[in-house]
A protein has these predicted regions:
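Generic structural signal for secondary-structure transition and capping sites
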Residues: 34-38, 89, 204
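Non-catalytic accessory segments flanking enzyme active sites
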Residues: 17-62, 68
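Short, contiguous pre-domain boundary segments
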Residues: 1-19, 176-178
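Short clusters of hydrophobic/aromatic residues that line enzyme substrate/ligand-binding pockets
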Residues: 41, 91, 116, 212, ...
Length: 360
């Protein structure tokens, strides 16, 4: 499917309804976008000690890529393929501590950095070992103890994190602790991009989120667009339950209750005075999506206040409208719409990037 989203939002039309129903586009997105995206995979506590090994599946049910986080004796963190280079067996099935990675199938052994080390009964095998006998090693970025990985990224993660740091660098994120009580997975009967569409605009807040709209100043709501990320700034009607900025901060003197950062294509970082809620949107099929919420808290006294007073309620309200849109786009009479040039900058940005990389 060839998509053409005009770069001028005042002239552009939204993604056609056919995009959300096209299986071929869904498959192409996997290879052209998700396999080339940066992915948030957790935090350093997954491999807190030296010689820690942590196997996981990246975007299970969609990418289904077996990976392995490794922390060596010199505290070097790696993200490796969890697939043995001999016959394709999964190397590890559960977290463990070991200075070596050993395949349980035929005994092939690797160092913690993924380099091939030993294979029994291969003395007569010619031209062995080769570079391809090492485990594939992927890019890793640690930011405030949060871990990201990528294979062949189209996004410059350093630029994105620098943009985020300019706004939230003053927060003690390195002291934030994972809170399982505020973390869960949501299953939504809708296309993954519809969920992102909804997240990327505050236009719907007065109509869908009555309680949240009493906290946020709708008329002051802002969206800032960058290359591969964007930021929505949630201003408050009052000073209570807002960030306390240092004097040299770009937003010093403003009543800001939340920063909502989105990284193309599917990661949301929601910053509040108490900490951060990270949302990862995982496509499953054309009509089903899973969204992972993970929260890290550095100030419990500020929980359940302001713009984050009831995140679960807001999520359910969002799911309700997104699932209604999923039903609506199946209409034979809806093709596409237009953007509000002032209120839907984030949605347009998302659609433009999708079209850019799908057409590349």
């Amino acid at each position: 499917m060839n998509l053409n989203i005009n770069s001028d939002i005042s002239k552009a039309e939204t993604l056609p309804s056919s995009f959300y129903k096209d299986l071929e586009s869904f498959k192409i997105i996997k290879n052209k976008i998700f396999l080339r995206a940066w992915h948030w995979v957790g935090d350093e506590n997954l491999i807190a000690e030296k010689n820690s090994l942590y196997p996981f599946t990246l975007l299970e049910g969609f990418l289904d890529e077996p990976l392995l986080l490794s922390r060596s004796t010199d505290n070097n963190i790696k993200c490796l393929s969890n697939v043995c280079t001999h016959r394709g067996n999964l190397l590890l099935l559960k977290p463990c501590k070991s200075a070596k990675i050993r395949c349980m199938y035929h005994g092939r052994r690797f160092k913690s950095d993924g380099k091939f080390e030993f294979m029994p009964d291969f003395e007569k095998t010619k031209n062995f070992p080769r570079n391809c006998d090492n485990l594939n090693s992927f890019l890793v970025k640690s930011w405030n103890k949060l871990l990201f990985t990528a294979f062949n990224p189209i996004v410059d993660i350093e630029k994105v994190l620098d943009i985020m740091d300019k706004r939230i660098g003053f927060l003690p994120l390195n002291k934030a602790i994972f809170d399982s009580s505020l973390s869960q997975n949501f299953k939504i009967d809708a296309h993954w991009a519809l969920y992102c569409d909804n997240y990327l605009e505050g236009f719907h807040v007065p109509f869908v989120h009555k309680d949240l709209s009493e906290v946020l100043d709708y008329n002051s709501y802002e969206t800032e667009i960058y290359d591969h990320c964007n930021l929505q700034i949630g201003y408050s009607n009052k000073k209570e339950d807002c960030f306390i900025f240092p004097k040299n901060h770009i937003d010093y003197g403003k009543n800001i209750a939340a920063y909502y950062f989105w990284i193309f294509p599917n990661i949301m970082f929601n910053f509040y005075p108490w900490g951060i809620s990270i949302n990862v949107v995982k496509p499953i099929n054309l009509k089903f999506t899973e969204v992972k919420f993970r929260s890290y808290v550095f100030d419990k006294t500020k929980l359940n206040k302001g713009a984050s007073s009831d995140l679960n309620k807001v999520e359910k309200e969002d799911e309700f409208v997104v699932q209604n849109v999923q039903k609506g786009i199946n209409s034979a009479f809806y093709k596409s719409g237009r953007y509000s040039a002032t209120k839907e900058k984030g949605v347009h940005h998302f659609h433009y990037l999708l079209s850019k990389f799908l057409n590349s």
